[in-house]
Curated annotation (Swiss-Prot):
It catalyses: beta-D-ribopyranose = beta-D-ribofuranose. The active site is at H20 (proton donor). It is found in: Cytoplasm. NCBIfam families: PRK11797.1. This is D-ribose pyranase.
Length: 139
């Protein structure tokens, strides 16, 4: 459910259409996007925009009740993992709910993206900088 204003019309549109438990992916520049899934490509060049920049804007608009991460992020990108967990903690406080964090293998994560409403590709070029956001409700 939308909570504010996003300038990108594709992102705004997909968020406004989300129902409870629908998913939306924010990913790095390297994650393969299934041909059956809508791709919203924000990547301009390596690192622009960053994963966290895209995630920050998306979560200003989207009510989130769960987040799915690849287990591999813990070992291969611990700094981003900590930044992401901190962001989710702040989002919980802002939304007034608990956001469940789930982990799965990267291979399974890639399969889950096929069921997503869209995949938003950032310019991030660090490993496992991907999250599946599960939509909540604002009431």
């Amino acid at each position: 459910m939308k909570k504010g204003a996003v300038l990108n019309s594709d992102i705004s549109s997909v968020i406004s259409r989300l129902g409870h438990t629908d998913t939306l992916v924010v990913c790095d520049a390297g994650l393969p996007v299934p041909s059956s899934t809508t791709r919203i490509d924000m990547a301009l060049t390596q690192g622009v925009p960053s994963f966290m920049q895209v995630l920050d804007v998306v979560t200003r608009e989207m009510q989130v009740e769960a987040a799915i991460l690849a287990t591999e992020i813990k070992e291969h990108n611990p700094q981003l993992h900590e930044t992401l967990l901190s962001h989710i903690e702040q989002l919980q406080q802002h939304q007034g709910n608990t956001i469940e964090i789930r982990y799965t293998t990267h291979e399974h994560f890639k399969k889950l993206t096929a069921d997503s409403q869209a995949v938003i590709r950032s310019g991030e070029c660090s490993p496992y900088a991907n999250v599946i956001l599960c939509a909540g409700v604002t009431f």
